[in-house]
A protein has these predicted regions:
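Conserved ATP-binding/catalytic core of the eukaryotic-like protein kinase fold
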Residues: 2-167
Length: 167
């Protein structure tokens, strides 16, 4: 995956591999040291065999997109880590270790991990896509959950956490 950006000093257009995002490179024209930006992830971008359809949500640990796994023609939730974590080798190792742990979990209330990797300097995790609304959206739309629904949800969450903790 290539990244195109301009030198902030002289305006020269640069093109470099996304694998070096976050690293400093010299401008070939004025020799200014520039930090290669993270690749832009947008609708239609293909990353590690997954074609991005649209953004599902953002959080402190990255963005989650609805994507199509091209090899299996199925929808997945594709988590993409922030650029600053993608260039930190220890963060990458922690991420891949967590992915290996997640891959061993098989529980009805835990989304399955399908694949993880790095493409063009971008770390990603493909997980099962669960169609529906987030709990946050439901509460915004309906207000507080009825007691029975809240208890049922907590029971499922506790079951998943207990299972994961035992593994």
């Amino acid at each position: 995956m290539l990244i195109t950006f301009a030198c902030t000093k002289c305006g020269t257009k640069l093109e470099t591999d996304a694998a070096v995002s976050g690293q400093a490179v010299p401008c070939p024209q004025c020799h200014e040291r520039l930090t290669v930006p993270a690749p832009e992830i947008r609708e239609g971008t293909t990353l590690g065999g997954f074609k991005i359809e649209h953004l599902l949500g953002k959080g402190g640990m990255g963005e989650v997109y609805l994507a199509r796994q091209l090899s299996m023609d199925r929808l997945v939730a594709l988590k993409i880590l922030p650029a600053q974590l993608c260039t930190d080798k220890s963060a990458e190792n922690r991420f891949l270790q967590e992915v290996r742990v997640l891959a061993k979990l098989d529980h009805p209330n835990i989304v399955a991990a399908h694949e993880a990797g790095k493409d063009g300097g971008v770390l990603f995790l493909a997980m099962g896509y669960v169609k529906g609304q987030s709990l946050e959206d439901r509460i915004k739309r309906e207000g507080h959950l009825p007691w029975k629904d809240a208890c049922g949800l907590v029971k499922k969450l506790a079951s998943a956490l207990d299972y994961a903790w035992e593994k």
